[in-house]
Amino acid sequence: MPKFSLRTLLLLFFGFGIALAFVCQVIFPIREQARRCSCSNNIKQITLALLNCESVYGHLPIGIETSPDGSPYRSWRRLTFFYMEGLPPVFYDLYDENSAWDSKSNTRFYDGTPVVQTDKFGSNRRVDSLDPCPVSWCCPSDSTKRVNYAVVVGEETAFPPNRNVKFDEITDGLENTILVVETLSGSDKWTEPRDLQFDSMSFVISKSKNGEIGSRHPGGANVGFADGEVHFITDAISPEELRALLTIAGNEPITRQQLIDRGVIR
């Protein structure tokens, strides 16, 4: 067995330290940048799906539909099926619009029940189970496999309870109004009508599962605006500024461009 001098060992440890520092300072940030870019693309796709819904129906979908007894009934996410890339065709046909999200016919979207899937020509039949959180709804920086993209539900937002919003109601400007946010508070069942609640938010960018906008990305979170643009909001944004971007007709003297100019939004 070869013997190493103290000097050789010190040089080896020094070289290892340099290599480790290189990985931490160069490789890891590059990987995170790629994950953040993928997350931004997810939000872009979801935001454009909502804009397509608005174009087809003349209004945005209801964020959380409730039943007569007040319990959550359906989520806005199911209406994006037709406009999302990468979702299996079976999604378009299986969802039962006449029953609740957690009814027997709709639990197969997340409980592992085998379903028959085919390609768009009706061939290549196979039996499979659906992913409870499809990749389009999960941020690659979050390993928990939960829904990372939500809307903010509230009377002052684009998603008031049990009511559709038309774009002409967004008097603050489409470019100044957030539709889709990143969060760590999502469900592990992507069809569950569960989103962020405007009235209980503190309007800070968070790294906890506490009903706030937040992410695993260092320094902030991605959001999608009503004009289709996706931006990274840094945690330097004030609660007043973030709140203003979530209201549709608050008439606040705060614009996205001002925040971009200040470096608060990228």
Language model: regions and residue ranges:
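Hydrophobic membrane-insertion alpha-helices, especially the h-region
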Residues: L9-C24
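Surface-exposed loop/linker segments characteristic of extracytoplasmic
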Residues: T8, Q25, P29-R266
